């Protein structure tokens, strides 16, 4: 009796049962992503903090595929763009985040920085930075620093 004759019924049963099999190079296919948009964003933050910007960007994109109005993921994606010197793209991310969440003060602050880095007129950057500063909170020192940078550029 050949090995093929013994193995064939098992292979057919596995194939018909829907159980995935491995052949050649192994590939993992995820049929259902168990992570939420927020969890993909958090994973992106972890990748970003370890310097793995490409993986972070992929996670932020996945978060946005799951929830296109996830302002936090959009701001984080803008930060990746900014880190790579793509200020125009970063600006678009921050503007979209503000459309989705008009009180996202990090987005306001980061948009002010993006406008400043692109040499844009400072009126909008100043207004954004002032609004972020007025929000108070634990990130107020960061927002004040941005406002000071905008004011310094205007002199």
Can you say where each PLM-predicted feature lies in the sequence?
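Residue-level recognition of tetratricopeptide repeat
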Residues: 36, 70, 104, 139-140
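TPR alpha-solenoid repeat register
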Residues: 39, 73, 107, 142-143
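Canonical tetratricopeptide repeat
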Residues: 42, 76, 110, 145-146
């Amino acid at each position: 009796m050949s090995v093929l004759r013994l193995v064939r019924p098992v292979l057919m049963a596995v194939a018909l049962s829907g159980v995935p099999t491995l052949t050649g190079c192994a590939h993992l296919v995820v049929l259902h992503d168990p992570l939420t948009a927020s969890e993909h964003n958090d994973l992106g933050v972890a990748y970003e903090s370890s310097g793995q910007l490409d993986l972070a960007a992929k996670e932020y994109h996945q978060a946005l595929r799951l929830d296109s109005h996830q302002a936090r993921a959009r701001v984080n994606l803008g930060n990746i763009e900014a880190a790579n010197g793509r200020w125009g793209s970063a600006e678009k991310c921050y503007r979209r985040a503000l459309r989705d969440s008009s009180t996202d003060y990090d987005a306001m602050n980061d948009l002010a920085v993006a406008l400043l880095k692109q040499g844009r007129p400072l009126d909008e950057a100043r207004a954004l930075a002032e609004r972020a500063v007025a929000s108070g909170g634990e990130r107020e020192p960061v927002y004040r620093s941005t406002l000071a940078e905008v004011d310094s550029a205007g002199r």
